[in-house]
Curated annotation (Swiss-Prot):
<keyword id="KW-0800">Toxin</keyword>
<dbReference type="GO" id="GO:0005576">
    <property type="term" value="C:extracellular region"/>
</dbReference>
<keyword id="KW-0964">Secreted</keyword>
<comment type="function">
    <text>Toxin that is lethal to crab. Does not produce the typical symptoms associated with sodium channel toxins in crabs, suggesting that it likely does not act on sodium channels.</text>
</comment>
<feature type="signal peptide">
    <location>
        <begin position="1"/>
        <end position="21"/>
    </location>
</feature>
<feature type="modified residue" description="Hydroxyproline">
    <location>
        <position position="36"/>
    </location>
</feature>
<comment type="similarity">
    <text>Belongs to the Hau1a/HC18/HC19 family.</text>
</comment>
<feature type="disulfide bond">
    <location>
        <begin position="44"/>
        <end position="59"/>
    </location>
</feature>
<keyword id="KW-0732">Signal</keyword>
<feature type="disulfide bond">
    <location>
        <begin position="41"/>
        <end position="53"/>
    </location>
</feature>
<keyword id="KW-1015">Disulfide bond</keyword>
<feature type="propeptide">
    <location>
        <begin position="22"/>
        <end position="31"/>
    </location>
</feature>
<protein>
    <recommendedName>
        <fullName>U-stichotoxin-Hau1a</fullName>
    </recommendedName>
</protein>
<keyword id="KW-0166">Nematocyst</keyword>
<dbReference type="GO" id="GO:0042151">
    <property type="term" value="C:nematocyst"/>
</dbReference>
<keyword id="KW-0379">Hydroxylation</keyword>
Amino acid sequence: MKPAIFLMLFVAMFLISEGEGFKPKDAPQERSVFSPVVQSCPRCHRRDHFGKCRKLDPCPDK
C-alpha cells in the first residue's frame, strides 16, 4: 500500500508543477528546487515555496 501513496504524491506534485506553467525549457530551473545549488534571484525578487523567483510589489531596496 505504501508505494501507492508515494505514486499519488508524485502525481500530485506533477500536477501542481503543470498548474504553475511548467514548460520543458524550464526544467533546469525547476530541478534546482531539489538540488543543493540554488541560483540567486534578480533584484526585487524572492524565491517562493515552489522555488521560483517572484517579483515583489513593494520593492524593498537594500
